Amino acid sequence: MSANDLSACLWRERELLDLLAFKLEEEQFLLTTGKSRWLQYATREVEQVMERLRAAGLARSVEVAILAEEWGAPQNATLRELVEAAPDGPWAEIFTAHLAALTGYTEQIRDLRDLNEHYLRTALRFIQEAQADGSSESGTYDAHGESGTASSSAQIFDLKL
């Protein structure tokens, strides 16, 4: 039955959207804690989930077209249009619940994306301001464990060591 197949596709898509929200929250955690070392991996994982979502979206489109033909709806019907064309029975309610969940995930993901973008822009602005400062001190240490900045204060050495 095509309605079952479409419902299964929608469940897979919901699981992927949930995973995407999790990955975006991971990315946000890395941004807010300054763990930029791991950011490339988190970004790659977000991209991988996005690829899986594209494939799931394509599978959903195929299932919608099959079910739309079965129910007499336009072949390129949206999920909302499919709900309107649904025959008597539980499918209208099931697909309405899927639509509400997908809409909720979309809003949550959009908010996470916007917040992550804000954090990235803030970090970029901070870096640009630091570079414009003209300060050449990097705050790193050389091979001898020294900061590389010359000290103007007198130093006492114990030559007996």
List PLM regions with ranges.
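Extended, charge-rich alpha-helical scaffolding segments
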Residues: 1-82
